[in-house]
């Protein structure tokens, strides 16, 4: 990766919860591991291009998750959102496909790096925890952070 892109990646993860909770050293290390991909309108991710890859963070653009069976909408994401966590430990076929609704720049955090952060950082671990009550608590912490940022504290 071009080292001149690192400040942009660092800035992005510094404003993307839960990665905003990492210390400076963790953010530096994480930024160096992120892969950058670009996708055009109408492109799709599915199966081996989605399952088992990592966490996809949308830098710019809009995507939809669509059920493979009937094409129905599962979710819609835009800049600052993440997707792919439910597919991170899968191999082969994915549960859904991702369709790009416009040209999109993705930051991809490899699954081994995300697993390391989940294990080593409480905020990241809580955010991606399988237990609903822990995830909800993490979301509450995120809401508090956003409110504090809006107030300028």
Where are these regions (language model features)?
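Hydrophobic residues at beta-strand termini and immediately following loops
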Residues: 37-39, 77, 109
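A short, N-terminal "cap"/entry segment at the start of jelly-roll beta-barrel domains
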Residues: 1-7, 11, 17-25
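A short hydrophobic beta-strand segment most commonly corresponding to one strand
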Residues: 103-114
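Short leucine-rich amphipathic alpha-helices used at interfaces
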Residues: 4-5, 10, 85, 91-92, ...
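Cyclic nucleotide-binding regulatory domains
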Residues: 18, 43-103, 129, 133-135
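A small-molecule sensor/coupling module
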Residues: 26, 93-96, 112-152
């Amino acid at each position: 990766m071009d080292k001149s892109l690192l400040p942009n990646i660092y800035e992005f993860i510094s404003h993307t919860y839960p990665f905003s909770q990492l210390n400076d050293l963790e953010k530096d290390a994480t930024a160096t591991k992120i892969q950058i991909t670009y996708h055009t309108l109408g492109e799709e991710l599915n199966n081996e291009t989605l399952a088992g890859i990592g966490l996809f963070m949308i830098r710019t653009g809009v995507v939809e998750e669509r059920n493979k069976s009937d094409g129905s909408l599962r979710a819609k994401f835009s800049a600052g959102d993440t997707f792919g966590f439910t597919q991170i430990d899968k191999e082969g076929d994915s549960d859904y496909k991702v369709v790009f609704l416009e040209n999109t720049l993705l930051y991809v955090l490899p699954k081994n790096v995300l697993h390391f952060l989940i294990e080593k950082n409480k905020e990241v671990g809580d955010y991606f925890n399988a237990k609903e009550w822990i995830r909800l608590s993490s979301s509450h912490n995120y809401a508090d952070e956003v409110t504090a940022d809006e107030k300028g504290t």
